[in-house]
Amino acid sequence: MNPTVQELVAALTLEEKAGLCSGADFWHTKAVERLGIPAIKVSDGPHGLRTQREGSTDPNDSIEAVCFPAGCAAAASFDPALTRRMGAALGREARANGVQILLGPAVNIKRSPLCGRNFEYYSEDPYLAGELAAGFINGVQSEGVGTSIKHFAGNDQETRRLSVNSRVDERTLQEIYLPAFETAVKKARPWTVMCSYNRLNGAYASENKPLLTDILRGAWGFDGFVMSDWGAVNDRVKGIAAGLELEMPGSQGVNDRRLIDAVRSGALDEAVLDRAVTRILNIVLLAADLAQRPAAFDRAAHHRLAAELAAQSGVLLRNLGALPLHRGQKVVYIGAYADQPRYQGGGSSHVNTTAVSALDAALLHDRMVQYVEGFPADRDQRDETEFLRAVTAAEAADVAVIFAGLPDSFESEGGDRRHMRLPDCQNNLIARVAAVQKNTVVVLHTGAPVECPWADDVSSVLCMYLAGEGVGEAEDALLWGDADPCGRLPETWPLRLEDTPCYLDFPGDGVTADYREGVYVGYRWYDARRMPVRWPFGHGLSYTGYVYRNAVLSADTLAEQGLVTVQVTVKNSGAMQGAEVVQLYVADTTGTPVAGGRVLQVLRGFQKIALQPGEEQVVTFTLTPRDLSHYDAALHDWYAAPGRYEIRIGHSSRDIRVTLPLHYAGTRLPPLQVDETTPLGILLADPRTAPVVQHALRDETAAMTNGGGDGLMPPEAMAQMFDALTLRNMINFGGPQAEEKLTKLLETLQDAVQ
């Protein structure tokens, strides 16, 4: 009979306990052979296995593996079932290669398009990111391999990521930057969480007790262990006390000794170390047991899956009729990415693989296409001869397809982009080709939005993001109409960098990153400012069409502890099979003031449905009070004001097809701090204090308003001035007894809000 974890912990020496809390090398935990405790192996990455080749001493010498779409592309699928299938495939590959924990998914929020690692991340929206991450984690772990969701938390830039202090207010943190982690933890129970490098509100993530213990374990119920990002530990003793169990990749015994010394000196309670070891061993023994399963995978099948996922993720941004292409047309492919596609980003997630290009796929399917390089893949350099060859070929063709994108040097882990532009050589060629060829198609290979100054001059734009090794086959199917584009944008594409929410603050001064935009990230920002964008969140065109009808709520009113269902019928009104992403947004139209500002609408549901021509399907969503809520920092909890909300269902955040009113019958009211400086407008707007103020200040109100009709001030201005008056201002008109009146009134008001 195998010993229990508790028995193992009791049998370990202090030195062995400390040793189990750090890695043995770059990719392994430590073993304790005398007690039968095995080492386990971890590996990158979130869209393909990057594990060190056996016998190699170079941690970057990786085996060949399947490269699936990066997070930016997978998110465009808007389909957690697809990320689950991708995760399951990665789990099979990991187990076949002796890997017990896969280091992913990465769910940091796309705060700015300039973040160099955006290609790994899912979305600007935490709800979408969380649902996709949960699908991925459930897929990987269904194969007996663990995951490490990362980077927890506030790691939304690469500039000075090892030390920068991300300053985020409580509401913004809880409403934007933590929910994706929360959803994944609650819905998928990842084996591990990886803490980030940065500081969050002054404390390194690796020693941030509110983050690692109070929120992650206390509020969300996480029951795995926390590991550091590679080299992210600042103070090992503080870290283990805060809830960081495993240091990776280890410090060659330096931090082990610090833990031992801290226990012996009394600075660290050995029970805290025992707790960390227990959490690690729970996962290590589970992983070792599941690793006994037979392990194999079909490389060809996984490649086909990668191509399928890439096709499901392609987003048709614009189409005036140039797509789909047809046999018999004279088509020219322009741009080095047609032959050398950019399909993944640089850094720890880089997979050793080979991709099929669009040119390869066209030849395989006997497409009659001409190819001109036009511009290089790896640099911004204009070759005049190639430039003119491309323009000439485009003018002579029926359709010109330009394969554009960002070189690796423009976006990669470790550094942020400096601008949002494509290389000049590409922008110039696109503009010139569009001037001579009305049927110009641009295919984009980027990990994040780029400025598209030529967008109104071309016929069609297809965004592939970084779509993995199957990108060429996917592009071929989408361009030639063998598949319908059904991807949707997981982020807003702004017209220009200056429009972005954190333009003035990203990436900060190198010491501090101030998240001054608050909750206004992505579409929340653009909607609040009624700002035009290039393409909105959730946008994506199709070769077919969809009609929405018969939308209905199960009830007109939502109770405080209740739920309502929303149903809508969606029909494929076109002549081609397709898949629609039905999106549900909630808008708070109660008019209740919200500290930090009210967001106009928030994504609270989405479903991707495949429909044959003429087929229709009823889509159902379920909503609870949490879906109507914002985070209230005074309550330290989620809060929905009673009143009217709108349920908006549509094709994108700015293509709403159906709007339904919903009344929320909540009885809970937010806390209200009352003192002599509280403005009357606030007190009169609150149902608890309004009657008290109206009764107590009748005489003072009359005194203040009697002069309002003498022409000195319009009634509207008088009302605004009255709204701004404080209790002290009003009572001061009461004469000698003002102080006594104020004291009694404050007592009554404070009793009313208890």
What are these regions (language model features)?
Residues 625-668:
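Terminal connector regions
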Residues 665-685:
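Low-complexity, Pro/Ser/Thr- and charge-rich linker/hinge segments at domain boundaries
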Residues 678-741:
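Conserved, compact domain cores that house catalytic/ligand-binding motifs in diverse enzymes
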